[in-house]
């Protein structure tokens, strides 16, 4: 089961929208493939600071985070857009992927 929660009042810069999409896709795929999660919650919210926050939380097995090609690509994309990506795990409560991006891509 995947639950999507959004709180956005406006559209996103196309580069930011792609980064949001890819982070959600990677987070959900990893939760199901590696964590064997039964429930995944995806939250996309706009902060008062003008940042976009993306959280992907799962109830999978958790464990050590081993960055592969997908997570490394997300990290680079976030940094190139002036944002940051963090991933945490506290077994056995699953994994929390958090992406913070500016509303508009950095030129």
Language model features with spans:
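Coiled-coil dimerization/phosphotransfer module
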Residues: 1-107
């Amino acid at each position: 089961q995947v639950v999507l929660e959004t709180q956005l009042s406006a559209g996103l810069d196309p580069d930011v929208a792609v980064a949001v999409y890819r982070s959600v896709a990677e987070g959900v795929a990893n939760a199901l493939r590696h964590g064997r999660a039964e429930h995944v919650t995806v939250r996309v919210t706009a902060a008062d600071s003008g940042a976009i926050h993306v959280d992907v939380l799962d109830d999978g097995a958790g464990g050590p985070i081993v960055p592969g090609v997908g997570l490394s690509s997300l990290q680079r994309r976030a940094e190139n857009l002036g944002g940051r990506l963090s991933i945490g795990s506290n077994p056995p409560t699953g994994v929390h992927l958090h992406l913070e991006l500016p509303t508009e891509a950095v030129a």
